[in-house]
Amino acid sequence: MDKNIKVSFKHVSKEYDLYQNKSDKIKGLFLPKSKRVQSFWALRNVCFDVYDGETVGLIGINGSGKSTISNIMSGVIPPTQGEVVINGETSLIAIAVGLKGPLSGLENIRLKLLMHGLKGSQIDSLLPSIIEFADIGDFINQPIKNYSSGMRSRLGFAISVHTDPDILVVDEALSVGDQTFYQKCVDKINEFKAQGKTIVFVSHSLGQVKSLCDKIIWMHHGEVREIGDAAEVAEKYDEFVKWFNKQPNDFKKKYQKEQKEKQKLPQEKIYPTPNANKYKMGLFDKCFLVVLLALLVLFGSLISTGKSFMGLFSATDNKVEQVTKVDKRTDWK
């Protein structure tokens, strides 16, 4: 029986504008696309499917687009082009993702569980297990802005694995922390694998990916370079890394610069996001929107001023009425 697709990326691209200052952001609202600031394509035409029960690894050098994929997959950011289909609830595990610095560890646990739709009684029943798994001692009652990266990773991992997600996205969350906690996380991931859950594992560690994953997606400067069996793709990636590291520094810098410049080139809309053009505003629409907002502000000011005048007249009427009553009482006497 064929497995169901849990995650599907079809011709997905992600563009960022490389703003240099605040005025560039304002220009970006009004100027045509061709006259805006320089763009950067973090992802370009990415296609892959992740099936039910698979554990898939995302590998690649820095800036290859791994975290961008995990953020799109988890709904943190939208794609610029293409179609993303997620069949199930996704939980992203990354260092400090979704954690609020001023809040304590305990408060963050409650907040994240509430955001996952859990009720008070359910949260209370999960708290002891999460606190025990995180194993950060008395720091659980301290603001997490005072936590080390390892402690934040521990807390984030502990919360996410206790929300019972359909799809677990682990983004470099095992790159910090000691070996004891790492093994605890690996055991939990293997437990999820045994339950048939879908796992996407993002890491620089080829050893971790090979030991945990069935399939590997090799990302290279925003594009898919290879997809296939974990052992085969890992071997090819390892060969590339060894070859690259042997090259002179001048060659490395030139190669990386060329790849970055390539990511700045214009992108053809191979697979537009459904209904994207329907909501795209032209220059006239943007100017109309600004004028409309200005009129609304002016109208609000006039209403506020009118209320002030009405209040003044009302106060005057009350005074006149009080004087009249006093005069009547005087006449009666």
From Swiss-Prot:
Please tell me where ATP binds in this chain. Answer: 60-67
Enzyme Commission number(s): 7.5.2.4
In its keyword annotation, does this UniProt entry include Nuclease?
no
Any one cellular-component term (Gene Ontology)? plasma membrane
Query: Sorted alphabetically, which PROSITE patterns does this protein's record hold?
Result: ABC_TRANSPORTER_1, ABC_TRANSPORTER_2, TAGH
Q: Keywords, A to Z?
A: ATP-binding, Cell membrane, Membrane, Nucleotide-binding, Translocase, Transport
* One Pfam family hit: ABC_tran
Please report the record's description of how this protein sits within the membrane. Answer: Peripheral membrane protein
Question: Which SUPFAM superfamilies does the UniProt entry name for this protein?
Answer: P-loop containing nucleoside triphosphate hydrolases
Q: Which GO terms describe its molecular function?
A: ABC-type teichoic acid transporter activity; ATP binding; ATP hydrolysis activity
Q: Where in the cell is it found?
A: Cell membrane
| ABC transporter domain ranges (all copies) | 26-246
Q: Which reaction does it catalyse?
A: ATP + H2O + teichoic acidSide 1 = ADP + phosphate + teichoic acidSide 2
Q: Which SMART domains match?
A: AAA
The record's annotation in Gene3D superfamilies points to: P-loop containing nucleotide triphosphate hydrolases
Q: Which NCBIfam families has this protein been placed in?
A: PRK13546.1
Q: What binding partners and quaternary form does the record give?
A: The complex is composed of two ATP-binding proteins (TagH) and two transmembrane proteins (TagG).
Please explain the role this protein plays, according to its UniProt record: Part of the ABC transporter complex TagGH involved in teichoic acids export. Responsible for energy coupling to the transport system.
Q: Which family does it belong to?
A: Belongs to the ABC transporter superfamily. Teichoic acids exporter (TC 3.A.1.104.1) family.
Q: Which PANTHER family does the record cross-reference, listed alphabetically?
A: TEICHOIC ACIDS EXPORT ATP-BINDING PROTEIN TAGH (PTHR46743:SF2)
| Annotated protein name in UniProt | Teichoic acids export ATP-binding protein TagH
> Which organism encodes this protein?
Listeria monocytogenes serovar 1/2a (strain ATCC BAA-679 / EGD-e)
